[in-house]
């Protein structure tokens, strides 16, 4: 982002002229790709999702509860602004990323034995569902993403609270320990 500011004197889309779809500046396209990768990393979407299961498994439950929701919702809010003023190529890329995130998240969760790793892969799938709301860009998409975000907030906080309590009482970490 500092390169964008240094080259164009600002970070608004009017300064950069990225939203008109006519840019042929390959350096600008490369920088935009790097910014996109940064946001995909922030919201834990595929293919930038490989860090999520390890962090969720190793970190304390209250920290994981925070990381599972708030950075994802903040990144999605920024993504809404980015997609609204971008060209169609970015939208197509986000559609592919959302589908890959949903598939990778669900298939990865299916194979897990550790409950926190399973929820990590579930979080990757949730990122894909939120990205679908972004690229649909109809009159209800922002409201749907906001509603989904509220549900994600309460369900993830509730799930990690239950995991925290049960892991303290029963020393449970694996899925079979919770049965």
How does the language model describe each region?
Residues 1-179:
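Alpha-helical transmembrane segments of multi-pass membrane proteins predominantly involved
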């Amino acid at each position: 982002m500092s390169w964008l500011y240094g080259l164009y004197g600002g970070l608004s889309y009017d300064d950069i002229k990225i939203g008109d779809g006519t840019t042929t500046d390959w350096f600008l396209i490369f920088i935009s790709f790097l910014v996109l990768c940064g946001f995909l990393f922030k919201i834990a979407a595929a293919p930038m999702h490989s860090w999520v299961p390890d962090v969720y498994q190793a970190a304390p439950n209250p920290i994981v509860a925070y990381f599972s929701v708030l950075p994802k919702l903040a990144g999605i809010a920024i993504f809404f602004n980015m997609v609204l003023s971008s060209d169609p190529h970015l939208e197509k890329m986000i559609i592919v990323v959302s589908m890959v995130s949903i598939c990778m998240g669900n298939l990865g969760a299916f194979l897990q034995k550790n409950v926190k790793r399973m929820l990590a892969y579930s979080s990757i799938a949730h990122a894909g569902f939120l990205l679908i709301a972004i690229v649909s860009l109809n009159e209800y998409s922002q409201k749907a993403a906001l509603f989904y975000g509220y549900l994600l907030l309460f369900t993830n906080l509730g799930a990690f609270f239950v995991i925290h309590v049960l892991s303290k009482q029963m020393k449970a970490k694996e899925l079979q320990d919770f049965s």
